[in-house]
Every structure is written in C-alpha cells, then in structure tokens.
C-alpha cells in the first residue's frame, strides 16, 4: 500500500469542509517527533498531543499530574515532526481554571506549534472557550467522559446514558459550539447519542468510544499499537498491530478503517 499523501495542510476551514462533504476525519495522539512523522505520512489528519501522556508516557494513574510545562515540551517535539496534519493540544488539569490562565497556557502552546487547543468539560469552561476564540485561538471542546474529572466521576465511566443525562450532554454540545468551539471530541458516549449530537451541531465531532456516527475518530497511539500502559484496556480500543507488520502499516490500517467506516465496529461502542 502506498504512503498516504495530502497535498494541503489541514486547517480550520478544511475541517468545516470535511463535515459538509461527509469525509471522515482521522485523529491520533503523538508525544514525540518520530511518531509524529509516521502519523503525518500515513493518513492522519489531526495529531493530538494529549495529556494522556501522563499515563502512557510518564506512568501516572491519571492525567492530573501533567503540567503546562510538560505539554509545552511534548508539543514542541511533535511539531517538529508534523507537516500536513493539524496539531491539537490539551490544556492540562486546572490550566483552564480561569480565562486568563487558559490564555497564558494556550499562548505558550501556540508559540511552540499548537494550532488548536482542547479543553475538557462544559459549565464555566464555556466562558474560557469564548475568551480564547475571541482572541483568535481555535478550540476543541472535549465532552462526555472527561479524564480530568475522574475524581468527581468516580472512575472512567460511560457518560450520557438515560434520557436526562443524554439531553444534558446534547445541550452542552450545542452550548460549546455557540461559545465558539471549532471541533467537538466525544468520549465514552452511547453511539446513538453521539450520532444525535453530530447531527445537532454544525462543527465536526471526533469520537473515542462514541460510535461510528461521529465525523471522525481518535485513539491513543499506544492503544492502537497494543502497548501495555499498565491500565485496563478500554472497550473502544482495537490493536491494529496485533497481526504483525510495522507501526506505519498499523497507522495506515487505522486511517483506512476510519475512512471506510469499518472502525469502530459494534464491539467498540457503547449503547444507551
């Protein structure tokens, strides 16, 4: 199979065009330049420097210990390996506690190569989203299971089950878009609900454990490669390196599966 090539770098307008055209968007995490180059050359549209690095790189039990300094360091590394993909970066725990604090952290990340900032949650985070967007910073709103809220949630659990919870999540998604979010990431949400949200909103949705009805998919690279992170393997994960081959081949297989709709399958999704 030939190496994927994209003639144009991904931009915010390109995301909107993909939504209009029904083109699936492929996203993966990376934490260093070497893997970023592989993703960039093999069909990945958006590269996410996630605070998941706290668990899969640093070995913590959650993402809470990750600092802005950590995110700046890894973003700078990944940015050196990306040419075509858009670089999306998490604001770590409490870096978005206030609009001013979020702007300071986001600015530091943009200066080393970030092109979009991802923020977890709704509520007061809507003010943060608006504040950043008003200052020309594209924002991805992460809803559903938000790992930075693991202590409040009591663990990593499916969100939005039941009519009341589902309605609340749909309202949060609409509010995030109204606040200016360019992209929504839906994590561990029943597939039917994620599909409804995807229809509700004008911006693309990226799912992880949210079914095939989203506009795109994301996985943690270590999960896609079957690497042991020391944590239970989520239901939504598929090991694309299980039958051998190369890292590049596994990334291509994932990208192709997202685009042709074969991933995620029913076994990787949750129901209401």
Swiss-Prot record:
<dbReference type="InterPro" id="IPR003700">
    <property type="entry name" value="Pantoate_hydroxy_MeTrfase"/>
</dbReference>
<dbReference type="GO" id="GO:0003864">
    <property type="term" value="F:3-methyl-2-oxobutanoate hydroxymethyltransferase activity"/>
</dbReference>
<feature type="binding site">
    <location>
        <position position="51"/>
    </location>
    <ligand>
        <name>Mg(2+)</name>
    </ligand>
</feature>
<protein>
    <recommendedName>
        <fullName>3-methyl-2-oxobutanoate hydroxymethyltransferase</fullName>
        <ecNumber>2.1.2.11</ecNumber>
    </recommendedName>
</protein>
<keyword id="KW-0963">Cytoplasm</keyword>
<dbReference type="GO" id="GO:0005737">
    <property type="term" value="C:cytoplasm"/>
</dbReference>
<dbReference type="InterPro" id="IPR040442">
    <property type="entry name" value="Pyrv_kinase-like_dom_sf"/>
</dbReference>
<feature type="binding site">
    <location>
        <position position="120"/>
    </location>
    <ligand>
        <name>Mg(2+)</name>
    </ligand>
</feature>
<dbReference type="InterPro" id="IPR015813">
    <property type="entry name" value="Pyrv/PenolPyrv_kinase-like_dom"/>
</dbReference>
<dbReference type="Pfam" id="PF02548">
    <property type="entry name" value="Pantoate_transf"/>
</dbReference>
<comment type="subunit">
    <text>Homodecamer; pentamer of dimers.</text>
</comment>
<comment type="function">
    <text>Catalyzes the reversible reaction in which hydroxymethyl group from 5,10-methylenetetrahydrofolate is transferred onto alpha-ketoisovalerate to form ketopantoate.</text>
</comment>
<keyword id="KW-0808">Transferase</keyword>
<feature type="active site" description="Proton acceptor">
    <location>
        <position position="187"/>
    </location>
</feature>
<comment type="similarity">
    <text>Belongs to the PanB family.</text>
</comment>
<keyword id="KW-0566">Pantothenate biosynthesis</keyword>
<comment type="pathway">
    <text>Cofactor biosynthesis; (R)-pantothenate biosynthesis; (R)-pantoate from 3-methyl-2-oxobutanoate: step 1/2.</text>
</comment>
<feature type="binding site">
    <location>
        <begin position="51"/>
        <end position="52"/>
    </location>
    <ligand>
        <name>3-methyl-2-oxobutanoate</name>
    </ligand>
</feature>
<keyword id="KW-0460">Magnesium</keyword>
<feature type="binding site">
    <location>
        <position position="118"/>
    </location>
    <ligand>
        <name>3-methyl-2-oxobutanoate</name>
    </ligand>
</feature>
<dbReference type="GO" id="GO:0000287">
    <property type="term" value="F:magnesium ion binding"/>
</dbReference>
<keyword id="KW-0479">Metal-binding</keyword>
<feature type="binding site">
    <location>
        <position position="90"/>
    </location>
    <ligand>
        <name>3-methyl-2-oxobutanoate</name>
    </ligand>
</feature>
<feature type="binding site">
    <location>
        <position position="90"/>
    </location>
    <ligand>
        <name>Mg(2+)</name>
    </ligand>
</feature>
<dbReference type="GO" id="GO:0015940">
    <property type="term" value="P:pantothenate biosynthetic process"/>
</dbReference>
